[in-house]
A protein has these predicted regions:
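Start-transfer (signal-anchor) and selected internal transmembrane alpha helices
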Residues: 1-37, 289-296
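Membrane-interface coil-to-helix junctions
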Residues: 39-93
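Transmembrane alpha-helices of multi-pass, membrane-embedded glycan-processing enzymes
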Residues: 93-107, 154-158
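Internal/C-terminal transmembrane anchor helices
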Residues: 287-313, 343, 347
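Soluble catalytic regions of membrane-associated enzymes that act on cell-envelope
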Residues: 308-518, 543-564
């Protein structure tokens, strides 16, 4: 009796849950989606949203409106750019994006008469949109479509609204002109989404109970304009590179090198989802417990697919966060991001080394050991070259590069991109500008604008470059654009004060710090898009005749990175001539003591090294004699644990770095 009651109790709970999901499923799924989106964008990827906004531009004037809207799918681009500007505030941007996702699910449910019982199906477009945006990754820096972040959600949602609206027309006499007008004008405004919506409208109209002649007429006119409209656009405009791309207008345009299977598949499926629901029929009734399992399984598939298809890379997130901090000139935050990651992965690095050590000890041959080491290399945290150079720049601005340059992990982890994006496209404007090369910064602003269009980011750095080189006329033109934005007009007003009153530049610590490095002939040369190599040569190859103390300080940092003894001593001799040497920075002492012992060309016996420097060097040598180094990668971790914050470790273990 008790067992029977227990089973009845369990069944009643399942029935109650199923009933609640059937009646309130749409709102339950909406709540889950809201939580997921706000956590993802508001917490984990807020810096990513800010960077997306900086790579776009929305101006409040009629010329900008005309330029954008008159292009095919221009209305979609314009509305997308309008919403993209709000990503500058991640909270506002996330709220808008979430509301649009929820509305897309609602309009899908209403348009295609999806029952409350099957409402989980209505959220599939929202999930695909999350996957499309989340799979962009490093293509953020090369994507040529303005407002790409909001284009899928707006294209799908607004086109589905059109399906709902035209489907309300009962008379075939009125629906045929409506389909024709929508197909033509909708395509010009929304591109491929309008074509897909036209197919959906045609299917829904064809399924109605009406005379056969009306059905045939609807079908013929719809097919005619589905083909005719893109062909006319292709022949009358120059916006499309090929006939195929004419049919795909409205889909964010990734370069061939950066396109990926996830992005392409999700985009294609999103377009198809405007057509497939038109064929929707309610799912057959099933038992309550089976229904609950089905809904839970679909929800789990949604969440798992979104997670697996999302581009997740620790270094990518850190690069963007550090880049945003540099834009704000928050140098401490740049260093803190790098330091926090070093500390965060210290425990996992230790576990990875223990695992590596046990596997290597169990290996029988050297080749087997090398294979194990190579396979497990990615188990250890290693910063990218951009992260390292951002951190070094921040230390220069804080004046602590000589004591802290090697206190955080160094390295050169490769990008998780289909094709490597050159560093100069990601950080060229920032590094060149703040290292006193505004002409190069300006050049890369123009290069980016020509290839990918003007955006907030390159407009700002072009403005700063022009102010530093007294090109106030060009700076005024760039500021004229920024003054017509919503979030950047305040910054533009501040910069305009320097144009109107050039004497204020001398009072700006930020500008003066850059100008102190501008002690060279202002001529452009070919950097071959290798920014690290160029900066090393710029600061260490030939010293300018009017070099400043600050120039010699920065030259020392780059000299240490060369790991070249002759380059170090040459820059060191310049440094001691122009800077206070009463308290020699720690890393300079470490390098001098190490190089002096490796090569006897320079007598270091009279140099006043700190006792801690000589003691750490002796300790490093003793540790080296006790721990045989078979390969650098295999022995890195134990040496890093003891000496990771010294130049000795950097010199011996940070090798074979590839710049890009």
């Amino acid at each position: 009796m008790a067992l029977t009651d227990s089973k009845k109790g369990k069944n009643s709970i399942v029935d109650l849950l199923s009933l609640n999901i059937e009646n309130y499923g749409f709102w339950i799924y909406s709540l889950i989606l809201t939580i997921v989106v706000f956590y993802t964008f508001g917490v984990e990827y807020s810096d990513w949203l800010i960077r997306i906004e900086s790579k776009s531009l929305f101006l409040y004037n009629h010329l900008f409106f005309q330029d954008v809207v008159l292009a095919p799918a221009g209305l979609l681009s314009y509305i997308s750019l309008f919403f993209t500007q709000f990503l500058h505030s991640p909270l506002i941007g996330t709220t808008i994006f979430t509301l649009l996702l929820l509305f897309s699910a609602y309009i899908t449910k209403v348009t295609y008469n999806i029952s409350d019982r099957d409402s989980v199906i209505a959220f599939l477009p929202a999930i695909l949109i999350l996957i499309i945006n989340g799979s962009i990754g490093y293509a953020l820096y090369t994507i040529k479509t303005a407002g790409f972040f909001f284009m899928p959600i707006l294209g799908y949602t607004l086109s589905t609204v059109a399906v709902w609206s035209i489907n309300k027309i009962k008379s075939p006499v009125l629906s045929i002109p409506a389909i024709i007008i929508w197909c033509f004008l909708g395509y010009l405004g929304f591109g491929v989404y309008a074509l897909a919506a036209t197919v959906a409208i045609t299917i829904l109209q064809y399924k109605r109970e009406c005379i056969t002649v009306a059905k045939i007429a609807i079908l013929v006119f719809a097919l005619l304009f589905l083909v005719f409209t893109p062909l006319v656009t292709y022949n009358l405009t120059t916006s499309a590179n090929s006939l195929l791309s004419t049919f795909l207008l409205g889909i964010p345009n990734l370069t061939e090198e950066q396109n990926n299977a996830i992005f392409s598949s999700a985009s294609a499926l999103l377009i198809a989802l405007q057509i497939i629901p038109a064929l929707y029929k309610p799912l057959p009734l099933i038992k309550a417990q089976h229904y609950l399992i089905f809904q839970s399984a679909v929800l789990a598939v949604y969440l798992l697919t979104s997670y697996l298809c999302w581009f997740r890379d620790t270094n990518f997130k850190a690069e963007i966060a550090m880049s945003n901090a540099i834009d704000r000139e928050d140098w401490k935050e740049v260093c803190n991001i790098h330091k926090a990651l070093t500390e965060k992965y210290s425990a996992s690095d230790k576990k990875a080394y223990n695992k590596l050590h046990s596997k290597v000890n169990a290996a029988n041959t050297s080749s087997e050991m090398d294979l194990i080491v190579e396979k497990m290399r990615n188990d250890f945290f290693e910063p990218s070259r951009i992260m390292v150079q951002y951190k070094n720049l921040a230390l220069v601005k804080l004046g602590t590069e000589g004591n802290q340059a090697f206190t955080c992990k160094d390295g050169g982890r490769e990008q998780k991109a289909q094709q490597t994006i050159p560093m100069v496209l990601q950080c060229g404007k920032q590094l060149y500008l703040y290292y006193g090369l505004p002409y190069f910064a300006y050049r890369w602003c123009i290069e980016e604008a020509v290839e990918y269009g003007w955006n907030v980011d390159n407009l700002k750095y072009a403005t700063l470059s022009c102010i530093l080189t007294d090109n106030f006329e060009m700076a005024d033109k760039f500021l004229h654009r920024l003054e017509k934005t919503l979030y950047h007009r305040k910054w533009a007003k501040q910069m305009r004060s320097y144009i109107d009153n050039p004497e204020q530049i001398a009072q700006s610590t930020s500008f003066q710090a850059i100008k102190s490095l501008m002690c060279y002939n202002n001529t452009l040369s070919n950097d071959q898009a290798l920014i690290e190599t160029y900066l090393i040569n710029h600061f260490t190859a030939k010293r300018p005749e009017n070099a400043t103390p600050q120039f010699d300080k920065v030259a020392m940092l780059w000299a240490l990175q060369t790991q070249d003894i002759g380059t170090f001593w040459r820059c060191f001799s310049h440094y001691v001539q122009t800077n206070d040497t009463q308290k020699m920075p720690r890393h300079y002492q470490e390098a001098a003591y190490l190089y002096g012992n490796l090569e006897k060309n320079v007598n270091i016996s009279n140099m006043p090294f700190d006792k801690t420097i000589t003691a750490s060097y002796d300790s490093f040598n003793r540790f080296s004699s006790q721990h045989r180094v078979r390969t650098i990668e295999e022995s890195k971790y134990p040496f890093y644990e003891r000496f990771g914050e010294t130049f000795y470790y950097y010199y011996y273990f940070i090798r074979n770095l590839n710049t890009y």
